[in-house]
Amino acid sequence: MADLTAWRALVDKELAGAPFDKLVQRTAEGLAIEPLYVEAPARATRPIGAASFRVCMRARPGEAAEHIDGGADALWLDGDDRDGITLAAKRDVLVVVDRFSTERFVPFEVEPRVVWLGFDPLASGLQLGPKIEQFWQAVSRAMPPFATGEMRNIRVSTLPYHAAGADAADELAIALSTAVAYLRAMNGAASQLWFQISVGRDTFGELCKLRALRVLAAKLFAASSIAAAIPPIHAVTSSRTQAARDPWVNLLRVTTEVFAAAIGGADLVTPLAFDTELAEPSALGRRVARNTALVLRDESYLGRVIDAAGGSYYIESRTDALAREAWQRFRAIERDGGIAKLIASGALQARLDASWATRAAAVAKRNEPVLGVSEFANLDEHLPSAPSGAAHGHRDAEAFEALRAKYASRDVVLVSLGTPAESRARIGFAKALFATAGVRAREAETGQIVCLCGSDDNYAAHAASVAAQLRAAGATKIALAGKPNGTAGVDTYVYVGCDVIVALEELLA
């Protein structure tokens, strides 16, 4: 294309010799995000005529009526909440039921048309380890009573893998391998499958993940000569993105995640309450979460648009790239013996640990910011000192929240080198950085824990001598706000791109 060639020539001119790849971003999966997408759109990946999504609320015993009366048309219940199940059946509300045991599975009488059973032994096995074999035995005993009707009984959930650190491609690969394991283990499983998947912070990446899941499920069924319809998708906003600090920001996180789920083509969407990490979700938290999804569906009309992202070459290209990467990873899992073998051997957990370590490093360096926690921390909020532990697995905010719980009482002094104009920018930077640990840094001439703030020229001329004077005055730890420069007497450096967790642990411990 002539226009594209001309554009590339202008870009190369502006880059002045720098590589074009400087403009190409990389996802956590290593996939390229190009700076410009101009080709003709690809075919949409969501079936034409797909229905609107249901708002599916996670309900504790006694909360079913609250959610139904508030507008929810699906409930996610524990199997023990038989009153909630009965109520939902009477009102034509779809019910997702978590109900299984390592020893036995207890069926219950209810209208088949309203229930999806959350029977997913492999996902549970990630947490239960050796007990996974008991789950396999439970599957064969439990399935016969539910082999007919419109119920869906076999859940393929990536929630525990997402919480453990899986990236999007791994989530999809694990979902496919889990589905294959169930298809092999149980006759007629194809019509009983449904997917449950987390939706995280990357709006475009996450909606592409849901679209890719449909593409991959269709490819898997075609390769297996299965004529069943593609399993429906239950999207759940991510527990990994929830923060205990400045929890009001979770309202915005959940909003973008519900949006991604809706545009990605989810059949059910569960929004988590903004205060999930503080304690059991409050009535306000539950109401706001429910209304967030209802507003997006009914007032913003996301539920009335068929495949809103279809036709965008950017979306279609990212979906295709993610699907291809996930398919390759799925094949690798199968070559290694399948998902059950990887779980039992601990290989999958090791893989997820490595993935989480990469993500945690990006969060620690604030390349992946957590607003209200690693950026723009609120020093005046008064919340429980530790999260409730409601979510299993990891959360993006966990390391910074732990830092704040340990060191919020520390006294940090900022010592200015040079004029106010020369030191103002780095003083502001240092105050914001120490706030992530709950520390209200103050400007003074000396203290036990000190951070030098000034210009590079002033550092070169005065930092070493000032550090020596501070040591003589009783300073035990000295930091410098700037890139490492070998200044004598400085213990650590804080700067944009540094590992904030490591730097503050060294300084505040």
List each language-model region with its residue ranges:
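Intrinsic disorder at enzyme termini
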Residues: 1-8, 14, 18-25, 29-43, ...
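Short, acidic/polar
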Residues: 60-68, 251-258, 426
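Short, acidic loop-beta-alpha module within alpha/beta folds
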Residues: 65, 208, 412-440
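Hydrophobic/aromatic ligand-binding patch that stacks against planar heteroaromatic rings
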Residues: 66, 260, 374-381, 433
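Short acidic low-complexity segments
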Residues: 441-447
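Catalytic alpha/beta active-site cores
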Residues: 1-198, 202, 231-232, 268-272, ...
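Glycine-rich phosphate/diphosphate-binding loops that line cofactor/substrate pockets in enzymes
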Residues: 68-69, 189-191, 402-410, 445
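Active-site capping/gating regions of soluble enzymes
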Residues: 182, 194-375, 476-484, 492-508
